[in-house]
Amino acid sequence: RRQRQMCIRDSEYMTTILSEYTEANNNMVELVICNNDGMAEGAITALKTAGYNASADKAIPVFGVDATDAAKELIAAGSMVGSIKQDAEGMAAAIALLAKNATSGAALMDGTDSYNVDDASAKIRIPYAVYTG
């Protein structure tokens, strides 16, 4: 039976998870998805300490979010599979447009036709980019 667990903070948490979910218990961690690259680094440390990810036959893929320089190095080294990169330039452009509209008296969403706009909640969704090296 597959279960989901949240990787909350660091390598200590991942070490605990790896001690509870083992091959011996027939309930092994198969994939680690972290909410940021710092958590992914901690997970990678814990996995390596437990003897994982040193070879392809005993590998558990790890993913993070932010595409930090450290994560890019881990991806290049083969220790991490990928990360999600936020589009800072796209976010800044959207914020600048909305600020301009708000200060000029224009309708807030004027000029947003090229964006992915959720009309039900007046949100502009800026796409993320997958980083795998």
Across the structure, where does each feature detected by a protein language model lie?
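Short, well-structured alpha-helical segments in soluble
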Residues: 12-28
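Hinge/cleft segment of the Venus flytrap/periplasmic-binding protein
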Residues: 90-133
